Amino acid sequence: MEGGLADGEPDRTSLLGDSKDVLGPSTVVANSDESQLLTPGKMSQRQGKEAYPTPTKDLHQPSLSPASPHSQGFERGKEDISQNKDESSLSMSKSKSESKLYNGSEKDSSTSSKLTKKESLKVQKKNYREEKKRATKELLSTITDPSVIVMADWLKIRGTLKSWTKLWCVLKPGVLLIYKTQKNGQWVGTVLLNACEIIERPSKKDGFCFKLFHPLEQSIWAVKGPKGEAVGSITQPLPSSYLIIRATSESDGRCWMDALELALKCSSLLKRTMIREGKEHDLSVSSDSTHVTFYGLLRANNLHSGDNFQLNDSEIERQHFKDQDMYSDKSDKENDQEHDESDNEVMGKSEESDTDTSERQDDSYIEPEPVEPLKETTYTEQSHEELGEAGEASQTETVSEENKSLIWTLLKQVRPGMDLSKVVLPTFILEPRSFLDKLSDYYYHADFLSEAALEENPYFRLKKVVKWYLSGFYKKPKGLKKPYNPILGETFRCLWIHPRTNSKTFYIAEQVSHHPPISAFYVSNRKDGFCLSGSILAKSKFYGNSLSAILEGEARLTFLNRGEDYVMTMPYAHCKGILYGTMTLELGGTVNITCQKTGYSAILEFKLKPFLGSSDCVNQISGKLKLGKEVLATLEGHWDSEVFITDKKTDNSEVFWNPTPDIKQWRLIRHTVKFEEQGDFESEKLWQRVTRAINAKDQTEATQEKYVLEEAQRQAARDRKTKNEEWSCKLFELDPLTGEWHYKFADTRPWDPLNDMIQFEKDGVIQTKVKHRTPMVSVPKMKHKPTRQQKKVAKGYSSPEPDIQDSSGSEAQSVKPSTRRKKGIELGDIQSSIESIKQTQEEIKRNIMALRNHLVSSTPATDYFLQQKDYFIIFLLILLQVIINFMFK
């Protein structure tokens, strides 16, 4: 045996020498012929398992004594060396017939089938699969067994947004389990240590910081939890390929690093050294005592100097895992670079282990199953697009005499200040598309947001956001037109393809309320790193000769890689010249674009044309770019043509935005859902007859078809009221605490180029096809109160969707919207808090009244007389005012 080993294998030799304390005088099954196979760096996995001594059930290693660190198990004596040589000589005397390839199963040596050259490849594959299943079973046993704990303590872990969270970490052989609480009930995630590296990380904060990472930036997370959990507890998002961890002190941190390094080796050493030939040891040490003993060893190793006290990894391993069942990580993941040099040299790589890495994500499949084709919505390129001319020409319209009579009839039904949302408007002023479609005009230049997401300077990032915001206004219909009021439950879907980044920007909108009319929308491009959501309440006010369409609400733009939210509002549309003059449509109002995280903001003012203004005064806009209260730059120009920016420090002015013909030519092309795949409540199919009549200039037919849709909506509302039912939205849900509408299937994780493959949409649900399924957690946005938390389910796709088949063969999981806010504060608790506040206010009010009465009773008589005098004077003044009014009436 010793002759077969290379000179560069001292660790392997010491490991066999140390095994005497634990294993006793067991016989090693090897011979002189087999020793020929032990090359300096290569040896098959099965040969390595035969080379290891087999422990017996009746021999145990004595427990360590804290008072004698150099006791048995940490120092090899001369007797141990001599006995080890005797064992080696016995193993060398074995006949050649006793040495066979190990078949990977746990059957008894007397009944196990030995692989021979004549055995077929089918039998070898069967043994290979059984070995994989056995390794999986051992790993699950290690994770679920409460007695196997290498180390457990509270640690602070830094999330994706660079904020720290205190979590309970339990270290087991090959895995690191992370929980929210010490009771191990709220599982957050499981880190697979077999492919991880550990490095100390400098930090300005107190404590000891180190990093656990994958050298190739692959995912370090397991698919499921120790009890089969598919989704972890709600916490801040954690990185996919690394973890930055901070311990309270340097000694604790180095203790954790030593424990993690040992756990990395345990993932492969356990499988090789703890194989039983039909027998398993009974547990002899409880979990508590095992944990304390091991923790003490690691702490002693950090407190003592290296010259006086050094621990051998294999000795610590045997001390902690002595007399326990077989625990190992998956056999398909043993090619970890963190393993010992001795392990790599002795065990080597076989032909089978070279192919195991491709199957490490799911060992439950015996044969790789074919990947199902991606099921996504079919989109077609938009054939026609109307772009209005710049200036006042495209915003004015001369009304015919026939239409004027309709306007006068309409004006008789309204009065100044009245809300026109419930008034049925004539069809000649309708633009042949829905308001949900109209809201998508802002994303033909979504590539500006792709550039902004990559911009490192926050000021330049704000400038790109403002530039994108202005790019959504120059597209306007010719004349004075108003889009359709969406029907309750109406939806609209479209997308834009980015040729530069090969990504897609998806737009989803739904009419979530009819009275009041609220439209919710969601835009997502995870690959380019941004998403946008919001809701708009449309109101109309009549002022006699003019009316205004007010868009209440806000949109929230989020850069996923930075955790920044840009909150922006909308201008209002103002139409004048209804009774006299030319009917003209303009934009007015003040728009705010604010990023609370960076402190940068923009203020844009859309100006209406003055009464005596010229044509140059139409569509004017001015604005400021600010950092806090400091103005960095100003904007001036026209929102449908040139806009200039002037830097306040240098006073230099340049063109900020100008929709030239070249810009319009390179705008992104919109793709809409194929008409045959649209649902009955999608905008294009729902309003198709009205649109056809308007395009044919048949106002009578358009009015009739519009009435049919509106009457069907009213009848449906009456039916729901009769049945005492409430309307349930398909794609959006209302947050009762913030009053905001949110997309049910929103995925705000940063794009992982190593795991995320493609983003797609099916039936209104935006999803991401991933290579490997990983647990996905979500954190509430900063704008929300800390009560809104959303749980997501990660199956084959990163966004949960009912009735969607996993592309890798796993079953889809149905998600109910009601389960997304289990962590939110109950409304009953809020009501009880309000009642408590009311009671406190009543008590304060009673105390104030009592104090006031006391002051009045102690007031001197002169003050009382003056008060009566004042009342008398006030009475005379009021009487005089009444007399004067009566005389001049």
Swiss-Prot record:
Residues 148-265 form the PH domain. SUPFAM superfamilies: Oxysterol-binding protein-like, PH domain-like. The chain crosses the membrane at residues 871-888. Keywords: Acetylation, Endoplasmic reticulum, Lipid transport, Lipid-binding, Membrane, Nucleus, Phosphoprotein, Transmembrane, Transmembrane helix, Transport. A 1,2-diacyl-sn-glycero-3-phospho-(1D-myo-inositol 4-phosphate) binds at residues 420-425, 482-485, 514-515, 706, 710, 714. A 1,2-diacyl-sn-glycero-3-phospho-L-serine binds at L420, S421, K422, V423, V424, L425, N485, S540. GO terms for biological process: fat cell differentiation; negative regulation of cell migration; phosphatidylserine acyl-chain remodeling; phospholipid transport; positive regulation of D-glucose import; positive regulation of insulin receptor signaling pathway; positive regulation of phosphatidylinositol 3-kinase/protein kinase B signal transduction; protein localization to nuclear pore. Residues 1-129, 322-399, 771-823 are annotated as: Disordered. Residues 781-794 have a biased composition (Basic residues). Widely expressed. Expressed at higher level in macrophages. Residues 73-88, 95-109, 116-129, 322-336, 346-363 have a biased composition (Basic and acidic residues). Signal peptide: none annotated. One of its GO terms (molecular function) is phosphatidylinositol-4-phosphate binding. The modification N-acetylmethionine is found at M1. Residues 28-46, 62-71, 805-817 have a biased composition (Polar residues). The modification Phosphoserine is found at S14, S65, S68, S314, S328, S342, S807, S808, S810, S814. InterPro entries: OSBP_sf, Oxysterol-bd, Oxysterol-bd_CS, PH-like_dom_sf, PH_domain. The keyword Ubl conjugation does not apply. Lipid transporter involved in lipid countertransport between the endoplasmic reticulum and the plasma membrane: specifically exchanges phosphatidylserine with phosphatidylinositol 4-phosphate (PI4P), delivering phosphatidylserine to the plasma membrane in exchange for PI4P, which is degraded by the SAC1/SACM1L phosphatase in the endoplasmic reticulum. Binds phosphatidylserine and PI4P in a mutually exclusive manner. Binds oxysterol, 25-hydroxycholesterol and cholesterol. Belongs to the OSBP family. This is Oxysterol-binding protein-related protein 8. It comes from Homo sapiens. The gene is OSBPL8.
